[in-house]
Amino acid sequence: NILSGPTGSGKSMTLKVTMEGLDKLHGGSKHILTIEDPPEYRIRGEGINQTPLVYDATDPDAERQAWAAGIANGMRLDPDYMMIGEVRDLFAAVAAFRGAMTGHGLWSTLHTNSAIGIVQRLKDLGVDPGLLFDPALLTGLINQSLLPKLCPHCKVRFQDHQDQLALDLVERVQRLTDVSQVYVKGPGCQACRGSGVNGRSIVAEVVLPTLAFM
């Protein structure tokens, strides 16, 4: 499973929550191994082992070699699930696919703007099409973004303010959903410090590849 999104979209937090969820699901009985550079969060769980990469930052090839070696060494520890912080080059990508071929449940991230873009990015890295287009190996494509949430105290009803919105937006909303349940950004209030928004939430695009899709 590959998770994508722009920098700051919460990918690392999603992986943390996913790994902790897997550990809880199996009651700590599964071996979950992470390889990260560096670990961004403490991932807690009985069966979870976090592994930071160690390499000479002054050597331009050291990082690439460290990722490839770290993934290969991690496979030898026979984890049930493995989380790789990021697929950065062909060596890491091939190592990840090899892990999937041996039955390891593998999660990682890429920088793309869409779920479908993950496939193109892996292709650009040089992954063998025989591996890339096998839905038994590439089982999930996920792209996520963080979007601001409307302030619950000052948000306003879409129906009452649609005359202030772009016509194409109004038509699209009316076509896709029940407008009585739609709200738009309000004028701001003390609770949101005048911004009209309060907090952020994930919006995710999820593709589960099939043979026909690939």
Residue ranges and their predicted role:
Residues 1-214:
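Short, flexible helix-loop junctions that flank or precede catalytic/ligand sites
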